[in-house]
């Protein structure tokens, strides 16, 4: 990369999702509804698992961590996007952009690693039921969660370190509603091929390796379920849980691979996929995981009755 004298860009201008006021109002209502479902839904999951003495297995501990990451991940972009619907000139400072990039990749990569840990937990519970409590003990569970967070942190540091060394001299317009790394790299005043290659390898490696590990574990489990088909309610319940996990994996990794594991060229679907990845995807935790789990639903009803309805009386 050449080291020349450039006029340093101090802010970026975001184009947003639409410039039409009527469309912006409709989008605001839709995305506000999504965010107001994500926030209390995942907070309720965390509170339920934390306060209910029966939800102490590793699966629920991992689910609470996933709920926290969903709140964090969606809150990195959603509040600013909602405000920008009513702002004519959508601006984010250079430092704010770097911070947004860091936390977005930190939370996103941590969630990918955590989903892999959850697949390991499901595999152990089904294939090694007699040794499950010994294998997935509290210590190992905490270590795996900590490693997921550390992996996300390292990945995010790599992405940000590559961005801050690039020169930005204008233009400073990002064709997005948030500080997307693919857009930022595209407007740098230098040959960004080496940085882009490392970013793609980092994101692609995490996405592809985690996806392969997840699909292999689920393929093994589905093959096992096929042999045990008709063996009872527990098998059907485990199979239903497995399909829920597979749905999550497809919704998480599909958009991420599309956006970050390819050359950073602009395509017409980029904004749609980004919205799905940053705002719609976090909806799936309360919907797919929680509403399909009888124990969590029962604990939620008990929590609402005890702490909310009783206070109103």
Swiss-Prot record:
GO MF term list: G protein-coupled receptor activity; olfactory receptor activity
Gene3D superfamilies per the UniProt record, alphabetical: Rhodopsin 7-helix transmembrane proteins (1.20.1070.10)
Keyword list, A-Z: Cell membrane, Disulfide bond, G-protein coupled receptor, Glycoprotein, Membrane, Olfaction, Receptor, Sensory transduction, Transducer, Transmembrane, Transmembrane helix
Disulfide bonds: 97-189
Residues that carry a glycan: 5
Extracellular side: 1-25, 80-100, 159-195, 261-271
Keyword NADP appears in the UniProt entry: no
Cytoplasmic side, ranges: 50-57, 121-139, 220-237, 292-313
InterPro entries xref list: GPCR_Rhodpsn, GPCR_Rhodpsn_7TM, Olfact_rcpt, Olfactory_Receptors
Transmembrane segments: 26-49, 58-79, 101-120, 140-158, 196-219, 238-260, 272-291
Domain of life: Eukaryota
Membrane topology of this protein: Multi-pass membrane protein
A GO cellular component entry from the record: plasma membrane
Subcellular localization, as worded in the UniProt entry: Cell membrane
Role: Odorant receptor.
Similarity annotation: Belongs to the G-protein coupled receptor 1 family.
Protein name per Swiss-Prot or TrEMBL: Olfactory receptor 4M2
Gene (UniProt): OR4M2
């Amino acid at each position: 990369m050449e080291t020349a004298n450039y006029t340093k860009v101090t802010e970026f201008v975001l184009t947003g999702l639409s410039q039409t006021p009527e469309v912006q109002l409709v989008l605001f209502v839709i995305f506000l509804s999504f965010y107001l479902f994500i926030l209390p839904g995942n907070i309720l999951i965390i509170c339920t698992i934390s306060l209910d003495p029966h939800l102490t297995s590793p699966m629920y501990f991992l689910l609470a961590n996933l709920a926290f990451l969903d709140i964090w991940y969606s809150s990195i972009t959603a509040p600013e996007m909602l405000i920008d619907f009513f702002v004519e000139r959508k601006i984010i400072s250079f430092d704010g952009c770097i911070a947004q990039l860091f936390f977005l990749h930190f939370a996103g990569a941590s969630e990918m690693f955590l989903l892999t840990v959850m697949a390991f937990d499901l595999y152990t519970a089904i294939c090694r039921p007699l040794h499950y409590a010994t294998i997935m003990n509290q210590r190992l569970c905490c270590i795996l969660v900590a490693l997921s967070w550390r992996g996300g942190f390292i990945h995010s540091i790599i992405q940000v370190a590559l961005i801050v060394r690039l020169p930005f001299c204008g233009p400073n317009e990002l064709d997005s509603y948030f500080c997307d790394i693919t857009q930022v790299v595209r407007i740098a005043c230098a040959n960004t091929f080496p940085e882009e290659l490392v970013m793609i390898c980092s994101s692609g490696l995490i996405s592809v390796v985690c996806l392969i590990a997840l699909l292999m574990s689920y393929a093994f489990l589905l093959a096992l379920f096929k042999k045990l088909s008709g063996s009872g309610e527990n098998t059907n319940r485990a199979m239903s849980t497995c399909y829920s996990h597979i749905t999550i994996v497809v919704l998480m990794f599909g958009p991420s691979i599309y956006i970050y594991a390819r050359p950073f060229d602009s395509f017409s679907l980029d904004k749609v996929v980004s919205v799905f990845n940053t705002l719609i995807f976090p909806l799936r935790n309360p919907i797919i995981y929680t509403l399909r789990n009888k124990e969590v639903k029962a604990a939620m009803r008990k929590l609402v009755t005890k702490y909310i309805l009783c206070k109103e009386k």
